Design a protein with these regions (language model features):
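Long, low-complexity segments enriched in small/aliphatic residues
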Residues: 1-2
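PAS and PAS-like sensory modules
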Residues: 5-6
Length: 283
């Protein structure tokens, strides 16, 4: 690796630095796999587009990602494959706007309930929802939410020159559900229904240490104390909230949100440039 532009300290306190650009960066190197807390750009040359996406997804982080391309199909493939919370196509990747581009990451760029700041679900995470008792009503709520929201890519901004889709995706690994005798049949049945409806991957267990495969999150429905801190050390969030009666509230917890902002103009011309399509979620 070498510096194309080397950072320089601009003040005595060390709080202001000139941006830096690194070239010759290799895949899986420190510069590739770590987050720079400073204005440093590390450039990796990929032999082809498919490899570039693979390398982009190899980091443990997934807050924002961007692409600049005039190839519509290339943009669509990137949108479908990239593992990050906020995607930007043919525009800058900073300056997320509340409601238009709700903000929040994937993987180690997220912890906790995972509802995006500035999105429809954020306030819901600050409330306590009653535990499910009426399974039939909860299932109806799940089905309605999935048909109208969960399976769709929705653009609430209504702009012509920029599309701002909000959609749900599957977690990259299963969600482990820890149960015991205190877990109700209604809770377990609703989880099974959500998994069947949305395609969410779920593993049930009575002992977390018995799970050998990798997992993305833990839903703790047992009466024992949840291992919040030990799991957090591994980058895993433990959700110990009861299964909610509101089917729409509960279903959203089993998927991960994604915001996709796409420029639909070329230098101000709405008839120019690619018009890639962003699709919703299928099982």
């Amino acid at each position: 690796e070498s510096w194309l532009v080397e950072p320089q300290q601009l003040d005595k306190a060390g709080l202001m630095w000139r941006p830096g650009v690194k070239v010759g960066v290799k895949p899986s190197s420190w510069s590739h796999r770590n987050e720079w807390f400073g204005p440093v750009l590390a450039i990796i040359e990929a032999p082809d587009f498919d490899t570039a996406i693979t390398w982009q997804n190899q980091t443990d982080f997934g807050l924002t990602a961007g692409i600049q391309s005039l190839d519509e199909k290339e943009c669509e493939e990137w949108i479908n494959r990239i593992q990050a919370g906020n995607l930007y196509v043919n525009r800058g990747i900073t300056g997320a706007i509340v409601n238009r581009q709700p903000f929040g990451g994937w993987k180690r760029s997220a912890v906790g309930p995972n509802a995006k700041a500035g999105g429809l679900n954020y306030v819901n995470t600050l409330r306590n929802w009653p535990r499910v008792t009426n399974l039939e009503a909860a299932i109806y709520g799940v089905n309605t939410w999935w048909a109208k929201v969960g399976s769709q890519a929705i653009d609430r901004s209504g702009l012509v020159v920029e599309k701002n889709f909000q959609r749900y995706r599957h977690y990259l690994a299963p969600v482990v559900v820890v149960v015991d005798e205190s877990t109700t049949q209604a809770e377990k049945s609703l989880i099974h229904h959500i998994a069947e409806t949305t395609g969410a991957k779920v593993i049930f267990t009575t002992d977390l240490s018995d799970v050998s495969e990798s997992y993305s999150r833990v839903r703790w429905l047992a009466s024992s104390k949840p291992p919040i801190y030990s799991e957090m050390q591994k980058g895993i969030s433990v959700d110990h909230r009861p299964i909610a009666q509101r089917g729409d509230i509960e279903a959203a917890r089993w998927l991960i949100e994604q915001s996709v902002a796409i420029t639909y103009h070329r230098y101000g011309n709405p008839n120019g440039g690619p018009k890639p399509i962003c699709t919703g979620l299928s099982k």
